[in-house]
């Protein structure tokens, strides 16, 4: 019963993340909705606890990747694209960080 609750929670979380990440982009919202629903339906009859755990981990990783990596761009002119950064967007650029390294 606990795994059913985790699956349902992940399902809801993925849909909430989809709505946040693809806000006002109806084509992307619909495509993401269909893909999420399709993947959950495909694995609906899974009974193996190990496989369920693996799928939950994969779904959680996908949610984190969507939330922290996807940037939405909006066309303003024919040659202008404005990027909308969300608060959850991962902005670290570690390999090119300007801060000096601390010596130990």
Curated annotation (Swiss-Prot):
InterPro entries assigned: Complex1_LYR_dom, Complex1_LYR_LYRM7, MZM1/LYRM7
The keyword Aminoacyl-tRNA synthetase is annotated on this UniProt entry: no
Keywords per UniProt: Chaperone, Coiled coil, Mitochondrion
Localization per Swiss-Prot or TrEMBL: Mitochondrion matrix
GO MF annotations, alphabetized: protein folding chaperone
Pfam families: Complex1_LYR
GO CC aspect terms: mitochondrial matrix
GO biological process: mitochondrial respiratory chain complex III assembly
Coiled coil segments of this chain: 21-48
Lineage top rank: taxon: Eukaryota
Subunit architecture: Interacts with UQCRFS1.
Family: Belongs to the complex I LYR family.
Role description: Assembly factor required for Rieske Fe-S protein UQCRFS1 incorporation into the cytochrome b-c1 (CIII) complex. Functions as a chaperone, binding to this subunit within the mitochondrial matrix and stabilizing it prior to its translocation and insertion into the late CIII dimeric intermediate within the mitochondrial inner membrane.
Protein name, per record: Complex III assembly factor LYRM7
Organism expressing this protein natively: Xenopus laevis (African clawed frog)
